[in-house]
A protein has these predicted regions:
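Extended, histidine- and acidic-residue-enriched regions that form the cofactor-binding/catalytic faces
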Residues: 2-86, 90-100, 104-122, 126-267
């Protein structure tokens, strides 16, 4: 029994981010059952005056690592640093990777993961570009799943850590009396504050003025004469906090794990 404890401790502390693993560690992890590859895309885009443009990448890394840890049978692949996004010279700092190019990259990397020995590949994204049932993630996942499932490998698109978790937690905050917000709003800013332990990504001195254009129902036009703020924020981020960010982080991870487990069970 005494000998088993160090082995358990070593397994628990073993790296699960493939960039931090040697090839022998990857081989051992695959042999031990960590055969799910998690691909999570980030992005570089303007996120309001208070948030650095690399927020998607900063959030994606710990999120996908936590998902892998909680699943127990997964390894986090390197975060892809670019994704489809809008661009404007008025708000510089965004870099758009068109959906077709992202699809080519995802397809190649997913097939490489299968060649390496992974039997399940999961595609996820931290940004909205290319997501949804008709988006590039879903398209690539279906194409590769149809191609490889007869040989025992599956490829899935897991969207709920973005779409479902964001919607649900936004509703929770609104019920608690917080303002609604989407891009650069209270959700994004709070999550970045929670993860930004080195104070590199969030300009906390600008939070007091971090309010942008209001969240409107889809299709609703601004009132006549309304002058857009156009600062990269949709909503009101002034009450953002690391405490809210921690709750949101946990909700995103739990939502992703639940969906991925359901997808794995469908094998």
């Amino acid at each position: 029994m005494m000998q088993a404890e160090p082995a358990r401790a070593a397994a628990a502390s073993a790296p699960i981010e493939i960039e931090l693993m040697t090839w022998t560690e990857v081989k051992a992890a695959l042999a031990a059952g960590k055969t799910t590859a998690l691909f999570y895309t980030g992005g570089v885009e303007q996120r309001g005056p208070q948030n650095a443009t690399g927020g998607h990448n900063m959030m994606a890394r710990p999120i996908v690592k936590a998902i892998a840890e909680k699943l127990g049978n997964a390894i986090a692949m390197p975060v892809l640093p670019f994704s489809p996004t809008g661009m404007s010279a008025d708000l510089p700092g965004s870099f758009d990777l068109p959906a077709d190019l992202l699809g080519t990259v995802l397809e190649r990397l997913a097939e490489d993961a299968i060649v390496n020995g992974f039997t399940t590949v999961v595609l996820m994204g931290d940004s909205g570009g290319g997501q949804g049932p008709d988006g590039i993630y879903a398209s690539v996942a279906k194409k590769l799943d149809d191609k490889h499932k007869a040989n025992g490998a599956r490829v899935f698109y897991a969207n709920e850590s973005y779409t479902k978790a964001n919607r649900e937690f936004s509703d929770i905050l609104v019920k608690e009396g917080f303002p609604p917000g989407t891009h650069g709003g209270i959700l994004d800013t709070s999550l970045m504050m929670y993860l930004d332990t080195d104070n590199k990504y969030v300009r906390r001195d600008l939070l007091a003025s971090a309010v942008g254009d209001p969240v409107r129902p889809r299709g609703q036009k601004p009132e006549p004469g309304y002058k857009p703020v156009n600062n990269g924020i949709t909503g009101d981020a002034r009450r953002s906090s690391a405490e809210i960010g921690k709750r949101f982080f946990d909700h995103k991870v739990d939502t992703a794990v639940k969906q991925i487990k359901a997808l794995q069970a469908s094998r």
